[in-house]
Curated annotation (Swiss-Prot):
ATP binds at G13, K14, G15, G16, V17, G18, K19, S20. SMART domains: WD40. This is Probable cytosolic Fe-S cluster assembly factor SJAG_02895. Binds 4 [4Fe-4S] clusters per heterotetramer. Contains two stable clusters in the N-termini of nbp35 and two labile, bridging clusters between subunits of the nbp35-SJAG_02895 heterotetramer. GO terms for cellular component: cytosol; cytosolic [4Fe-4S] assembly targeting complex; nucleus. The keyword Chaperone does not apply. One of its GO terms (biological process) is iron-sulfur cluster assembly. The keyword Lipoprotein does not apply. It comes from the Eukaryota. Results from a fusion of two genes coding for two proteins which both play a role in assembly of Fe-S clusters in other species (CFD1 and CIA1 in S.cerevisiae).
Amino acid sequence: MENVKHIILVLSGKGGVGKSSVTTQLALSLHETPFYSRKLRIGVLDIDLTGPSIPRMFGMDAETHRIHQSSSGWVPVYTDETKEIGLMSLAFLLSSKNDSVVWRGPKKAAMIRQFVSDVNWGDIDYLLIDTPPGTSDEHLTIVESLLSVTSERPQLIDGAVMVTTPQNVATLDVKKEINFCQNLKIPILGVVENMSGFVCPHCSDCTNIFSKGGGEQLSNTYHLPFLGAVPIDPKFGELIESQSTEHPLIEHYKQLEVAKLFQKITQNMLDSLFHSPSLVLDKVLSGHRGRIWSVAVHPTLPLVATASEDKSVRVFQAQTGELIHVIDGYHTRSVRRVAWRPIDRPVLAIASFDATVSIYEKIDDDWECVAALEGHENEVKCVAWSHDGVYLATCSRDKSVWIWEAMEDDEFDCLAVLQEHTQDVKVVAWHPKDDLLVSGSYDNTIRFWRDDGDDWVQTCELTSHTSTVWALNFSPDGRLLASGDGEGEVFIWEKLVSNEDAARTPSTNILRPSLEEEWCLKAVLPRTFTEPVYTLGWKDDHTLCASGAEGTIGLFAYEDDVSTWHTVSLKEKAHDVYEINTIAWTNDSRLLSGGDDGLCNVWKLSEADQTA
């Protein structure tokens, strides 16, 4: 059990409400949920000893599929050769499926304890435990047994899902299950109302053959999440009865309409499990007369800057949203990017489509242009300061990356012009703790740059993207790099140990072997976007925000395994019908987003995030 990440009980107060059906569909939906970055490994433990249904639900004949013993314990029965869904049930141990189980409580308890102690699940993401009706020995035994082997887990059981039908006779018994969980301090993830209507197999209309809404009413009474209502779908029943090796449940289930319902139910359950936050609009920073291209938060001072195609930059007080100053009149074309120098006074680098970069500083009560950087032959697309404010990087449509050093008396010295990209360079970003620069381009590549003492050289090139790299952002600890592209993909990269072998690259910059580094693709975020991702922002080392052309803000996170990310929250139409070009986090965990509507929205996370 030590390699089981999450344990969820599925409970019902009364038999015949379709609890095993719900368990089966939760397992199938979790396995392929789009809210994770990969297919999940699922285990299903059937502790309904006298009436085990899980083998039949998955089409695994209990007389031909048997439990095997290995040196590390009992091996689950897997639904296919991928071994991504494993099953454990007493039915796999009985000599005949017609055998009755006439056991007293102590023998039942011993069997359940053996399931907990002897089954080798391997590394699985979720273990769903299908329980018998009521609150009896089996329920107490599974909880006590899990406690004895999972004492190091921060939470004994991650939660329980309640299954009921709409009728009062069913919801009455579920109330007892709720009390059971509350007495044992088991979190209740929510209620599923099963058999909520009947779907006609001919016209697909849904008719209420029982009462409706009992499960939702129960949720409201006990202030529990209502996960969703599931109608009786004859097509699902037909699939269960007709499945075979040639027509496995796992392949055909996803084509059913009920599968779409369970994807939503599964996401609601995950939201409850992870205390998923929602974005709530706090205030709006306005005043620009064109789209906002960039928003930047000062690292230490309560200042926010927004840059717009109206050729201006507006500076706001971060907490109140009060307009402090408007910087305009210098640039002759759209201002594409703005960046605060990470020092304890207000200094801004402003990049423009007029091919120049201006440096503004607040001196006394006014904002003055203290330097102008020229040299790019075309639009400057991005500007970024190094972690200590010593270096400034700029990139342009002219395919080049320039590195400047900030000198005394507001002077800037151009240290390098990097011309290895073959197309428009869209973005540059610095490592938060090291003098490492990355750049992303219309040529679909990400390139890494370091100072080798004589010149700035390319130390790594990543070519996994198949479209324009629009966004790059390092995690606050510098361990991970996120990249977003023109096809809506977001990649997560992690640095490997540097390779001391001699570098072989066609680059004009000669690379010393000791500087060569390798970054490995660790994850692709859950596929949320189909249009370009323009902007990325880390809330913390484990939580990343992404947005772009679709106008949806996505919040994603991982727990312990950096290769496994899940969707935390989605905010659709965050700027109505407009694209979002930029996001940034404030020091008090508010999110800023700037869009084509010319507005900078300030979002607060719901309180639930504080316990996630």
